[in-house]
Design a protein with these regions (language model features):
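Terminal alpha-helical segments
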Residues: 1-131
Length: 131
């Protein structure tokens, strides 16, 4: 059984419509990542889709992540546990760190090869989730 720590997660009964909206948002971001050849856009929307997938799966379990420092790490940890795949935490955290460098430290340029590998990784997470 997965433990949703109260300092990071709040128990919340989501309506099915809300969970469907989370899923549609995650799928929309994945579609954007798949439809462009701009590496930075592929990466950003792949990462966002992965986080939103985690938010949706956590919501299905009746929890909402608390919005505070480190909450993306907690989403990735739970996503990894829910899908029983340690690589999701490892690669997801690598994506998070690269995103943070890009966002907070003046940026970086991710090559096409790396961005497409991340996209394939995120697509595999969706498959593992049955989506």
């Amino acid at each position: 059984m997965i433990n949703f720590e109260s300092q990071h997660f709040q128990k919340l009964a989501f309506k099915e419509k809300q969970i469907d909206q989370f899923l549609m948002s995650a799928q929309h971001d994945l579609e954007i990542a798949e439809s462009t050849d701009i590496s930075d856009v592929v990466f950003k929307f792949s990462y966002d889709a992965l986080i939103k997938l985690g938010i949706m799966l956590i919501a299905r379990k009746g929890y909402k992540v608390r919005s505070k420092s480190g909450h993306h790490v907690k989403i990735l940890e739970k996503l990894s546990q829910l899908l029983k795949d340690e690589d999701i935490l490892v690669l997801g955290n690598k994506m998070r760190q690269e995103r943070n460098v890009n966002l907070y430290d003046g940026g970086f340029f991710l090559g096409e090869k790396d961005s497409l590998e991340y996209l394939e990784f995120v697509k595999s997470a969706f498959k593992k989730a049955g989506i």
